Swiss-Prot record:
GO cellular component: extracellular region
Signal peptide: 1-22
Keyword match Secreted: yes
Keyword set, alphabetical order: Secreted, Signal
Compartment annotation: Secreted
Domain of life: Eukaryota
Main subcellular localisation: secreted
Name this polypeptide is given: Venom protein 49.1
Length: 92
């Protein structure tokens, strides 16, 4: 068992020291999150589908940010939703 662990560790070290596995890819950039890694992988695997999914994602983000902007606008109209009724009554 001990020799198996040493042997597998040796193979692992050889694999890590392999110059081809350590070479950076030309377009390798720092990716800050897993979702960006997934997007890059999908673009490389399915280039035709990634273009259409990018358009769908942009549309989805516009919908989300549009609804968030509307919600923020509504929030800015009223100081605190918990005290909305008492606040409205004091202005009348």
């Amino acid at each position: 068992m001990k020799s198996f662990i040493i042997f597998s560790g040796l193979i692992f070290v050889i694999f890590l020291s392999n110059k081809y596995s350590c070479q950076p890819v030309a377009d390798n950039q720092y990716l800050s999150s897993l979702s960006e890694n997934v997007k890059v992988l999908e673009q490389r695997m399915y280039p035709a589908m990634s273009a259409s999914s990018a358009n769908e994602e942009k549309r989805f983000q516009l919908e989300i940010f549009g609804s968030m902007a509307k919600a923020e606008e509504q929030r800015s109209r009223y100081p605190n939703p918990l005290f909305f009724h008492s606040w409205k009554d004091t202005e009348d």
